[in-house]
């Protein structure tokens, strides 16, 4: 009877094994296995199923209870990164990746190193695969919980902008332009270069104290070909990107030559960086302008801008807007003067003579000189010589390829001499291999070193534009001071003349009141040599009356009293303008000096550090590969 029970029990266990996929435990042991009942959340309550083994004689059939978790954990998936151990039911419910896992490609653990497959230090899957909870950039203002509200740093990691393709679009009448297909989250939109220009122009007017990232300069293919070294050269596009831009993901749907391709990829890189940097700016993302730019419903960006009352009401010049809120520009701001080049030179001379705002001006003068020198070192130093080095390596690659072909032909001619032909073949293969390695190196230097350096130069230019904006506001303030001092001097002079005229009129009125006849004889001059004759004063009065009649015939001249009133109004307006510009200048100076420029410096340090790391890695890998190639040649020569 016991054997029959064992058979039935084994059959039951086999049936459970087929249903659950668990192996049958060996005889002679007893244990409890907790089977996970997967619920909607991926975690179920354990269901105990006793499994009894065959117990030997003399045993008391005591059951040893042992709870074994069989739920599929994150560590059991070979495509998931290793998670924490020691899970409990409550801990499993708190794992962020348990609800919806995003498979991770194991190939992404390694970069294209051509030889060694060096592992990358990538971020955790939970961080890199986090998706945005809303399609709107300013969704942070919505009613979302604190745990679900994505921060700017999280959006930077999870929501990246990519330009998927660049294609030629015809406008008709033989005209065409390059359109860029932008992907953000789950939507795509098509924009042209002039749309990016318009967006940046609006951002500069909306955020005059913020460093707006640069976009590539507008130039024709011909001009761009002249501005780059080796414009006719073709460079191999690297399989790995640099920074946040991977050019291998962008496709050019057009028949273009080498110069066109480099210009388009240059624009793709800088425009992608431009949009991604805007996404990380907390001040800009509080508005909806980036959302509007990436909205597929806004097919024509220029029509959208023209139809917006906010954009159309912005002042044309950032020098005539309220820097704290350009959409709320006051009447005083709109009437502020705009300094020109001549006034700048004049005011610089006067300011240096009078030593006005010496400390503040000196501080920003030093900052401007430092940033100008920084930009010059990047543009005419590192960037310039790296372009030259890239061209040299490109020419060397061509020479290696040609000399490899020559050695191959020579080996074919010396086929009857087996040993010599073999040595020539090894040399041919070595030069060909070095040429291939150089081609990869040149492509990486051009796209992943020179292009980021060029972007750094443009960023330095944008920083200097911000410093220049502060300088123009300073000159504007000096212009108002100069104009105010001039108006005050005019008012004092006019009041002095009015007082003199009043004295003359008073003397004439006094003489007329004494007698109806006017004594034209010279009165006794007892007032000293500086006194004026009575006749002279009288004739001055007649001349004044005659000039008034004459002027009334030709044109109506403003009388001194009215001119004095107008001057007082102008002085009042200039005083208000001076107060506004001084307050603006103080705010602008603090924001630029204490916020924007330090932030720019930190970002540039990080970017340049990454560029230098890439540079040393590329050169090291090429040197290692080239060394192995020539070591192989030496081994063959030693055994020959």
From Swiss-Prot:
A 1,2-diacyl-sn-glycero-3-phospho-(1D-myo-inositol-3-phosphate) binds at residues 192, 194, 218, 267. GO terms for cellular component: cytosol; endosome membrane; phagophore assembly site membrane. Residues 140-301 form the PX domain. The keyword Cell inner membrane does not apply. Residues 475-512, 562-593 form a coiled coil. It is found in: Endosome membrane; Preautophagosomal structure membrane. Its main location: membrane. Residues 1-63, 135-155 are annotated as: Disordered. It comes from the Eukaryota. One of its GO terms (biological process) is autophagy. Residues 1-18, 135-153 have a biased composition (Polar residues). The modification Phosphoserine is found at residues 361, 363. Pfam families: PX. The modification N-acetylserine is found at residue 2. The keyword Thylakoid does not apply. Keywords: Acetylation, Autophagy, Coiled coil, Endosome, Lipid-binding, Membrane, Phosphoprotein, Protein transport, Transport. GO terms for molecular function: phosphatidylinositol-3-phosphate binding. PROSITE patterns: PX. Gene3D superfamilies: Arfaptin homology (AH) domain/BAR domain (1.20.1270.60), Phox-like domain (3.30.1520.10). Required for cytoplasm to vacuole transport (Cvt), pexophagy and mitophagy. Also involved in endoplasmic reticulum-specific autophagic process and is essential for the survival of cells subjected to severe ER stress. Functions in protein retrieval from the endocytic pathway. Required for proper sorting of the v-SNARE protein SNC1. Belongs to the sorting nexin family. Forms a complex with SNX4 and ATG17. The PX domain binds phosphatidylinositol 3-phosphate which is necessary for peripheral membrane localization of ATG20 to the perivacuolar punctate structures. This is Autophagy-related protein 20. It comes from Saccharomyces cerevisiae (strain YJM789). The gene is ATG20.
